Amino acid sequence: MTTIERITTPRIRIFDTTLRDGEQSPGCSMSPPQKLVMARALDELGVDIIETGFPASSQSDREAMALIGRELRRPSLSLAVLSRCLQADIETSARALEAAANPRLHVFLSTSPLHREHKLRMTREQVLESVRKHVSLARSYIDDVEFSAEDATRTELDYLIEVARVAIAAGATTINLPDTVGFTTPEEIRAMFQQVIAGVADVPNAANVIFSAHCHNDLGLAVANSLAAIEGGARQVECTVNGIGERAGNCSLEEIAMVLKVRQAFYEQDSSINTPRIVGTSQLLQRLVGMPVQRNKAIVGANAFAHESGIHQHGMLRHRGTYEIMRPEDVGWEDSQMVLGRHSGRAAVEARLRALGFWLDEDELKLVFEQFKGLCEQQRVVTDADLQTLMQGGSNAQGYRLASMTISDVGSRANALVELSDPDGNRVAETAQGDGPVDALFGALSAATGVQLMLDSYHVHSVGIGADARGEANLSVRHEGVEYDGTGTSKDIIEASALAWLDVANRLLRQRQATAHNSTDVPTPATA
């Protein structure tokens, strides 16, 4: 039997629904073995409840529940499955939960006027009777039963209170009030939780019931609404890793966990999340479902702890608290990133050069900084290899340059011929075939340069207006396990793609040159 803690406990339960609601995001389906891998990571992350799927909907979800239930036996971990308010669904779900050490049966029914009339075609009284009947049935199988009033935030408040009273009287141990379509606002959901909790206070055992928030992100308010629900009395938040889910997604687990950690003094609540595992869990999910997060995603995005502004970098060098409210290592990143680009100042460039072993006097630094600024006009980001090349006097800094290219069709495939000028000024020509013009182009560039790149993502868009518009190609690639980004701009999008590819290849070339140079001539730091 699962012990239900009182709502006064100063801890927010994290109900992870990545494997159920998150998986409903287009393109994010997972096989049972993949779900098991993800469930292991969620267990290590420290979530309180893992919703593994919807057993009545597929054999795959039943298999996943069996795999996960047999392996994950942590006493403080509950495993949940979702069920409609239908006898057959509940019986199927109860059987699926037999493998779980601490099972939870999660039943739901729509309660809003829109859903009652157009989806269920049921009256208010019929919905109440269905809740009473099916929560009681679920409780006859499982001691821990959660009831969700689907579309709660668009349900009449007096009726929502009545539904919650019936569900609690029938044996529900958790009442979930979902913002199913991401419609509500923080002020509204805070008041809703306060009034529903007050409205059920006299129902027997209501003091032991946990109220839960499940917020969608259609208006970008899922995390804000979940926090407001906590202020209103919710003690469970339903969320997903990386915020994946239907439409615009769900409340982001990593964001809610870090808000509670960073602002613990304000919310006077915490969670059981092992936060240094957040980034690893996020990256595992990205690999499993093939859905990367945007670079500026809070907590887990590549830019979450990256600083390019010169003012910010200068402050960070003096005290990291000037521009960071949490430490990157607290969520699983190794360290903050000082991204050197056109917004960077001399202090950041000098600090990076010293980290690379180059100690310069004021005149030397002034000269190198001018060269650095010139390089920033040619590329978005300046890497360690670029700095090392500057310190070597810029030898071969130009790298490979595109001289010409020809794309043609060969039956159902494309053929690319590229001619490059190598770093020494020699001409190199290579051809390759591919499934399309870009695939063939990248193959020919690889043959010409000897650089092998694994493409992760690629997109093009227009820059400028009218006749002055140019195509910009952006790609992310991997080389020997390291991720690189490249950018190219041209009137022709295929040429822009070639320039983006060469942007990365030339960076790797400079890196090799710098490594070779340093292996024979390592600069000695000045003594203090």
From Swiss-Prot:
Keywords: Amino-acid biosynthesis, Branched-chain amino acid biosynthesis, Cytoplasm, Leucine biosynthesis, Manganese, Metal-binding, Transferase. Its EC number is 2.3.3.13. It holds the Pfam family HCS_D2. Residues 401-528 are annotated as: Regulatory domain. It comes from the Bacteria. PROSITE patterns: AIPM_HOMOCIT_SYNTH_1, AIPM_HOMOCIT_SYNTH_2, PYR_CT. GO terms for molecular function: 2-isopropylmalate synthase activity; acetyl-CoA C-acetyltransferase activity; manganese ion binding. GO terms for biological process: L-leucine biosynthetic process. It is found in: Cytoplasm. InterPro entries: 2-IPM_HCS-like (IPR050073), 2-isopropylmalate_synth_dimer (IPR013709), AIPM/Hcit_synth_CS (IPR002034), Aldolase_TIM (IPR013785), LeuA/HCS_post-cat (IPR054691), LeuA_allosteric_dom_sf (IPR036230), LeuA_bact_synth (IPR005671), PYR_CT (IPR000891). Residues 12-279 form the Pyruvate carboxyltransferase domain. Mn(2+) binds at residues 21, 214, 216, 250. Belongs to the alpha-IPM synthase/homocitrate synthase family. LeuA type 1 subfamily. This is 2-isopropylmalate synthase. It comes from Stenotrophomonas maltophilia (strain K279a). The lineage of its organism: Bacteria, Pseudomonadati, Pseudomonadota, Gammaproteobacteria, Lysobacterales. The gene is leuA.
